[in-house]
């Protein structure tokens, strides 16, 4: 289980350093390493086999919005805001587009990108950018509740399920179905699946091994 959050209560992730990027230097690609660090970060979060939860304790701007979209779940404090203000300084959130496109409806996404106006917590919940909104005092309690609920489930089922969901995102529906059919026997043959079946039949709590 991985919970991503910011230090303190002001920001989850404030985005890039505008002063440091004033000359455009940070945005120049290294010919020997053309992948942008933000893109690698989002991909790593999405591909992570452990469940990821964004604990949004304050403003999440630019890359912060991308991190939230790359996570599996998100819990947001009601005072927080999520935005992509790059257009206000003559930029566009190029590397943030891919993870956000997978979560937000296109029209709301474009509104955020071309106006630079951030979403309130209420709006983020409405558009499924986050799972839950709480007051600041209840943020840790809600995150802990989710962590406990996930921790009670089979680690191997979650691990294989996350792999499947991530792999199927760019497939056609028939491809998704064929891929799912190949994975179903694999998950059913794990130690956790056998333990889960036996625990259900004998009416006891399963003891997961994660294998």
Labelled PLM ranges:
Residues 1-4, 53:
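Conserved hydrophobic packing residues within short motifs/helices of P-loop NTPase cores
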Residues 6-8, 162-165:
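A general secondary-structure junction signal
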Residues 38-42, 146-147, 165, 180, ...:
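Hydrophobic alpha-helical core bundles mediating ligand binding, dimerization, or RNAP-core interactions
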Residues 43-156, 189-190, 194-198, 204:
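Crotonase-fold acyl-CoA enzyme core
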Residues 205-211:
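Short C-terminal tail/terminal secondary-structure segment
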């Amino acid at each position: 289980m991985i919970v991503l959050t910011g230090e303190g209560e002001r920001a989850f992730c404030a985005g890039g350093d505008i002063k440091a990027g004033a000359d455009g230097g940070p945005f120049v690609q290294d010919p020997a390493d053309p992948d942008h660090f933000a893109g690698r970060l989002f991909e790593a979060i999405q591909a992570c086999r452990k469940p990821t939860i964004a604990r949004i304790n304050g403003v999440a701007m630019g890359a912060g919005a991308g991190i939230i979209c790359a996570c599996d779940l998100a819990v947001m404090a009601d005072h927080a805001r999520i935005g992509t203000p790059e257009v206000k300084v003559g930029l566009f959130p190029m590397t943030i587009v891919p993870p956000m496109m997978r979560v937000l409806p296109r029209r709301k996404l474009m509104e955020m990108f071309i106006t630079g106006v951030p979403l309130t917590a209420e709006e983020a919940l409405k558009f499924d950018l986050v799972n839950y909104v709480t007051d600041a005092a209840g943020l840790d309690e809600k995150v802990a509740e989710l962590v406990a609920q996930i921790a009670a489930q089979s680690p191997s089922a979650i691990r294989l399920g996350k792999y499947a969901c991530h792999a199927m995102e760019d497939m056609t529906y028939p491809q998704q179905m064929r891929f799912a059919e190949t994975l179903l026997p694999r998950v059913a043959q794990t130690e956790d699946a056998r333990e889960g079946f036996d625990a259900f039949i004998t009416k006891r709590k399963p003891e997961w091994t994660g294998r």
